[in-house]
């Protein structure tokens, strides 16, 4: 993705089957990638990847510095269990959604942001915030990510 070209040392979590969404399988791949990196990581995730990242985060919380969660999918739409997803994340996070996302209502994205203890930003009519909705390069998203990193660094200073 464009984000990968803008952020050095970025690694994409490859899924065995991008067309088959299985939360436990996808979360396992996120955990494997975090383990392979070795250092603490920042997460940028989109759609179902947000759910996988949040699920993985609870088992690797000490290894995650923060997360930008863009257009999170609604787990109910995929028949996924939500019990684990209903806890606050122990690191800074921002959920970005759209008022006309076909995969999740803005109210559901805001609900999940609240459950996760994430800041929430609705960027208006932006669809699923992907290439299909007219987003290729997304400088505003990169700026949001860099601000999240900066605010996190300020918050952890003594």
Where are these regions (language model features)?
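Active-site catalytic motif of lipid deacylating hydrolases and related acyltransferases
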Residues: 1-39
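Catalytic histidine neighborhood in serine/cysteine hydrolases
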Residues: 9-11, 113-130
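Catalytic histidine-centered segment of alpha/beta-hydrolase-like enzymes
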Residues: 21-24, 126-137
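Conserved alpha/beta-hydrolase fold motif
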Residues: 42-43, 67
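Gly/Ala-rich beta-loop-alpha elbow adjacent to hydrolase catalytic centers
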Residues: 44-53
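A conserved short beta-strand
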Residues: 62-75, 92
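Acidic catalytic loop of the alpha/beta-hydrolase fold
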Residues: 75-76, 99-104
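Short beta-strand/loop motif that positions the catalytic acidic residue
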Residues: 89-90, 94-97, 101
């Amino acid at each position: 993705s464009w984000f990968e070209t803008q952020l050095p040392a970025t690694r994409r979590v490859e899924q065995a089957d991008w067309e088959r969404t299985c939360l436990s399988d996808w979360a396992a791949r996120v955990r494997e990638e975090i383990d392979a990196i070795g250092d603490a990581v920042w997460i940028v995730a989109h759609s179902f990847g947000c759910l996988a990242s949040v699920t993985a985060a609870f088992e690797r919380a000490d290894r995650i510095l923060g997360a930008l969660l863009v257009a999170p999918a609604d787990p109910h739409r995929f028949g996924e269990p939500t019990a684990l997803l209903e806890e606050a994340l122990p690191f800074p996070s921002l959920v970005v959604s759209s008022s006309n996302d076909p995969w999740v209502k803005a109210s559901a994205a805001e609900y999940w942001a609240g459950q996760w203890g994430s800041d929430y930003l609705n960027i208006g009519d932006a669809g699923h915030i992907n290439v299909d909705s007219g987003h290729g390069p997304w400088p505003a998203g990169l700026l949001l990510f860099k601000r999240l990193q900066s605010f996190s660094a300020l918050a952890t200073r003594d």
